[in-house]
Amino acid sequence: MNEDAKRGAGRNVKKGVDYFPHFTNSMTHSSTIFTIQEDFGNDGYAVWYKLLEYLGTQEKLYFDTNDRQRWKHFVALCKISQETVLGIINSLAEMNAIDYDLWTKHKVIWSDNFADNVASVYKKRGVAVPTKPVFLNDTESKGVPQTEPIMQLPEIKSSFDGDKM
């Protein structure tokens, strides 16, 4: 066993990330930041980065806003009205900065770009990068998301013909 493996033995794998890239050219090269700040001023900018920070604290990098306590906590962190936070998040979904379907159907926040930007952290840990949650019943507005693809079983056709016995 190598020294790194010995040192890591018995440690719990860290959940979430401690940092994420905040690119210095985001104000001029990111239509998301430009648009959200144009529409909502500094509140838009602040909510977007607080949302990314919040996603980074989550074990699977998504935020299920159906959990009322966690939602109220997030809104309180933003220091603005819930209506403004919702307006900003709706705009982020319309711009596909967060997954539109997960937000509109399930009120779950997931960002492919965020997960891609922190993937190297998980690779260094030797664990799988969290994947976008998938819901068992996509028509329900609430539910427990799955992060593993749902396997469809093939239809079994019987060759038994009862008339030929």
Model-based region annotation:
Residues 41-45, 63-64, 81-86:
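Alpha-helix N-cap/helix-initiation sites
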Residues 31, 42, 68-72, 83:
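Generic alpha-helical secondary structure signal
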